[in-house]
């Protein structure tokens, strides 16, 4: 059994080994071995944000200012508009709220508008990135049974995808060191997340695996990221999906398959890794004893759904070798 810091070191070493060309075919199995060293933890009290109403009023204040600027067609550089750092901290904390009016239509909508309309300074964007990829955000209560920390984890990743998009298409505010840290943290998060809930009654969306798809799609679009790093990220997503024992019922598998098949069409290296992984999944089914627990059956059906989503993508959207293999093995549960 190991602690989170040790797992992070093992994943960092794996990433370097993939870069060096020392690991490829065994990447999934090595990740699996590392993940299995992390013991599940008992449920503990989740710390939730306070001051939701006050944060909402601050969001409304800034949104009103931004709307007035837009109506007057003012040039941003000529207007004294600035979100106070203290308010930004207050608002981003609401991403962890179980209440959608503070989290989803509140903090997420607000941050999305601020990022897309270039209303945060580069310093604030860098701070926001560091905040969202911190252990306290991405790994909060992640080894425990289902809990309210899922909102903190999932919406941190969702906003990260917006920051990565902005960094790629507008001003590159992230340093190489920060980008590397983002890749390390997101990869480990994708491998560790086990909460597959989509829409949760009055609390609204959690949707972690769709958000994983979004942020990973942005990582795959990084123009200067070497192929070995993209293989590592791909491996982490597939390793995490392999371990998932909860159903994904709100389109998450479709989104993941869309992102994975798209990158796999970009270079044969990614297609080879995807095909290798699918063959290992199929081999596990043939060689292992039949599932006996609900967890084992759910893992089996999750992988089956993954196969079927590849077929639904269509032959033109999937590498030929991958599509042909999945077509032959489409009776995955037989």
Residues of each region from the PLM?
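Eukaryote-skewed repeat-based solenoidal scaffolds used as protein-protein interaction platforms
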Residues: 114-266
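Long, repeat-rich segments with strong aromatic
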Residues: 223-318
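N-terminal alpha-helical scaffold/docking segments in eukaryotic complex subunits
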Residues: 1-116, 282-334
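A sequence-composition feature that detects small, non-aromatic residues
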Residues: 55, 66, 70, 74, ...
